[in-house]
Every structure is written in C-alpha cells, then in structure tokens.
Amino acid sequence: MTRPIAGKLALAAGVAISIPFMAAAANAASSPAPIVIPDSALHAMSTTVGGAKPQPSTNTLTHFFRTAFNPLDSTTFGFNMVGQDPALRRSTTITVDVTPLNVNVGGATFNGTDILQPTLTSPVFTDNDYTSTQFVSDPAVANGHGPGGTLSPGNTSNQLEDATMRSQFNEQGTTYHLLHNPVLHPAITIDVPKPQGTLIQTARGVVAGDIDATWWSTRIQNLNNSLSYADPTHLQLYLTDNLMLFTMNNPLNCCIIGFHGASEVVGHGLGSTHGNGNQPIQTFAWASYVTPGFFNPQRAWTLQDIDPLSHEISEWADDPFINNFVQPWTSPAIAPACSNVMETGDPVVGVGFTKETNTFRQGPTPNGTQVADGFYHPEDEALLPWFMRLNPSPAQTAQSGTNGRYTFMGDLNPFLVFHAPPPGCPA
C-alpha cells in the first residue's frame, strides 16, 4: 500500500508568480501547427549541467566520499554520493524544494502544476513494497513489456531511490536510508520566445513543447541564483509537463527529458563572491512528466509518467556534483558512443518496470492507441559495481542467486550486458 511519508509534505506560502524571461508566447490562433516528428527521430536523452568540487567545509547537501578499485583497468576511482556512508547504517533525509514550472511555448501552455499530484503520489515520494513488480521492459514484444517477478526483497516500505541505494550497497532490510522530504513552492510561469521553442507531435497524436536546451538550462540556473528559498543543503527540483529539449538549433534533434547539475552559488546570505574557491554548492534537477504514448511503446514502453524524474533523482544521488568519473563504458542505450561519467540512468534508458497504481492520464492517445496501463514506470538504474567492473558484485544478490546484481532490476533487465560487468570501450 502506498502512503505519503507522514509529516513530510509542506506547502510554502505564496501564490503562483510569473517571470517573463523573454517575450510572451504567441497567440494560439496565429501559431503554426505542431511539427510532426517520426518515431525514428525520438531519442530520449538526459544531460548534466555544470559541476563542482566540494571541499570538506563546503556548505552543500549531506554526502559521503568513498573509493572503489576497478580490476579491469587497475584504477582506484573516488566518488561522492548523497547521504551518509551506507556502512554506518544511518538514515538521511534531504529536503527537496519542488517548484512547478508553467510554460507557454508555441501558442500552447504546459502547466507543471497539472502533474504535481500524480508526481507527489508516485513511488519517488511515497513508500512502496519492492519485493516484486507487475511488468518489466521487453523490446522483443509488440507492446514493449512482459510479465515481471521478484524485484528487490527486503525493500518493503521505501521510496524509490531509498530502495535503489539500499540494493546498490546490499543494505536492504537495514537501518540505512536515503529519504526525500518534498516542500512545495509557488509555480513559476516561463514564456518561451518563438525562436527558442515550438510544438512537436508524435505519430500517436501526443503534442509536447520542444525548447532549445541551452536556453532552457540557462533559465534553470538563473532560478537557482534568484529564488529566495534556494538552499545548498536542499535539492532544487523543477517539474514540467510534456516538455522536451532539442539541441543544435534543430527541433528534430529531440528529446532531452531531464537533467541534473551542480554549481557554486552566491546571494541569499550564502556567501560572498570571494569564497576562496569554497562557495556554497547548489545541486538541482529538472524533469518532465511524459504522457503515455509520446514515445513508441515497443521501443520505449517505460518512457512515460515519472520515468524521467526517476532517472534524474537516481543520477543526482549517485553523482551529485557531476564529478564521479569512471572507466569509459557503453551500453545498448548509447552505443556506439562511450561515456566516462557514472550517470546511473544513461546506460539503461528505455528499460524499466511498473510500481503502484497510477490513475492520471490513463486513456488512449489522440489517435486511439492505448499505451497507458494503470501503473507508474520507474526506470532501472545501473549500480556502482557495474561501472567498477566488480565480479562478483557486492550489491544485492540477483534473482538467480549466483551473484550480486549490476542494476536495480537485476535479472529482470532484458539485456545481458547488465547481468555482468561491461567490457571496456573500443579504442
């Protein structure tokens, strides 16, 4: 049974405010029709923004530092993660400042306030039993998913990231926790000028806003430095509804659906501009709620509702300052490219599972395709032993019982590359 964490939901006083960063969106009557984008051009992506190197005295969120030895390249890597060292078996609660963004783009309005309730009642912020899951990704079948099974025994009443971190360090069933305390703030309205945004429509008739990634990331960083409630010990979380980002000045180079970042900040009593290299560090994330059917369900069934948010929260927890570097890796999600950053969601984009009932937007798409299935869709996440090429894996034992797992889903992940350490990247 799902329940909000008792006493952990607060509403900041105030009313919705508007920040006209640029010219107001065009009138709907004079707006061009959405650009129809084929499924072949829909590529779910995420990115990172900024990065910072905390010192022991830095004013920022609670985190710990560890090292891990990679036997494949004989290198010891250091990493920072949110919370306290799991070996201490302590509980850490991070305040999450939740700011919905109501966005006018291409003559249409996409209100982040519309998706607040389904987000706050999702597995990201509520306790669930992760012993099993109903369905999991299976790209070999037409609807993109198949039956689930045993998922993460021992995580019986946990928020999603808490369960993931406990599985990663084999601490399920212990007193180790990483929890989120969401605090709601007034909605902010952003008007996107025509050159920086438009509307796109997929083959199933779902319409989304499509915004230039550079322009959007600048708006988010401006908010980090201007909002009076910004606190470096909190996570600043910005939520939108059906907004995608494009790159290279081309709306068809789509679709970034979330990012997380870190940056040194000043103002609001947080320190002077002369911090001698030790200014407060603010971590932040943006994620879009995705209507079922925007992405092709066979290719990316799990890419709906909270999938982008689960991706960004997990990556923020495992790499809050964007400085956890590892031996280069690749996966089916990014091949033939390689990455040397420990971004836990990037290897498994498009792979996930179901958890908890979702009643929001469960009808067919505008062209009549029924994609929604009545559940939330968290993304799978690659774990530290996968990036470190550890064999055996010290994470929670996989369902087969022969080794520790390499992703949160373990043996339920349909790709064998995630059932063992990955090889090195081609030279």
List PLM regions with ranges.
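Active-site-proximal segments of metallohydrolase catalytic domains
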Residues: 157-266
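Extracellular structured ligand-interaction cores
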Residues: 232-234, 303-304, 313
